[in-house]
Amino acid sequence: KIDQWYWAKKNYYSEISWTFDPLVSRNAKLNLIKLGVNISSYHPNFYGDMPDALNAGDESDRLMVSWKVVGENPVQRELVSTPKPNDILIQIPADIVAIRSKDREENLRWRRKVREQFLQAFEKGGQVVGFSTNSEYVVRI
């Protein structure tokens, strides 16, 4: 992704966008902390049914992110260790991939719970401002 950022800068793009699975903790950390992206929206079942071995039986919810291509280098964020009192915390499992491989129903429970929380938070005008040390998205209204 860093190489893509520099390529975009060299080619005069102002922003890069993509999606990622909101339940995958390592992707959340990469996108929010290492890359410092902004989450713009939540899309339930974005790709529809994906019958491959990894995704079969799951719903393809995705967060849409945008990454500003400004300055000399990408800006990283810190993990949030102490959220503010009014922040909404959206917990995700530390390893959804392991859960998905063992218990599809548990995976779907997580998927639907996180979906509901994100949609409610965005409906209230919430913005994702970080990711906590406890595998939680930090949403500020």
Which residues are covered by each model-predicted region?
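Conserved hydrophobic beta-strand within the GNAT/NAT acetyltransferase core sheet
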Residues: I16-F20
